[in-house]
Amino acid sequence: DWSDPENPSIDHYSKSKTLAEKAAWDFIEAEGKPFEFTVINPALVIGPSLSNDLGESNKAIQMVATGKMPVAVPLQFGYVDVRDVAAAHILAMQKPASDGERFALAEKDMWYEDVAKVLRENGFNKAPKLSVPVWAAKILANFSPELKMALPYIGRVRSVKYTSKAKDLLGWNPRPAEESIVATANQIKDLGLIK
């Protein structure tokens, strides 16, 4: 499915990604398909970074692991490891069947309370133990810039079907999201960003 760029609740990042992809497909069509074209749309990309720059997605894991987010808010995202995104790109280049296809990638959708539980089970004891309902999270968003950005997504159940197409056409086999979450938190800890 495509994001609706005219929807007033869509954030600028998602809108720009949607418009850029549509422009690319329009170009391919207008030019008579001058080359192979495949689109890979990963969900929230987490996992070990090659540098000390965590990136925005890994900062979400940091917020939960450090307790900066003192309660788990009702946010659900698809999670995919950066190493699995790289593998999907390589597979797409190797498999002719990927031409003209769009692949939405995530290993699974998880609520923040589930992410917090995974982190606590792996020694990150500052991860929140309590969850708040949607109405409370929307009130809290007035006091937190990070939550305010996520306001359109609070309480929203994801309905994207991610992996089956990539698994079937590419032979893509992502690692469990839980493994990626822990690897991310461990790297952040090793960088001294989790005490």
Please report, for each region that a protein language model flagged, where it lies by residue.
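Active-site Tyr-X1-5-Lys
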Residues: W2-T38
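A conserved pocket-lining segment of Rossmann-fold NAD(P)-dependent short-chain dehydrogenase/reductase
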Residues: D4-S9, S51-N52, N58-V80, D84
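Residue-level signal for the nucleotide or nucleotide-sugar donor/cofactor binding architecture
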Residues: S16, F77-R83, M110, R175
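Glycine/proline-rich active-site loop of Rossmann-fold NAD(P)-dependent oxidoreductases
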Residues: E31-F35, G47-A60, A92-R102
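Conserved SDR Rossmann-fold cofactor-binding beta-strand/turn motif
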Residues: N41-P42
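Conserved sequence/active-site signature of Rossmann-fold short-chain dehydrogenase/reductase
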Residues: V45-G47, V85
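Mid/C-terminal beta-alpha module of Rossmann-like enzyme folds, strongest
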Residues: A88-M149, A177-K195
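Conserved C-terminal active-site "lid" loop/helix of NAD(P)H-dependent oxidoreductases
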Residues: L140-G171
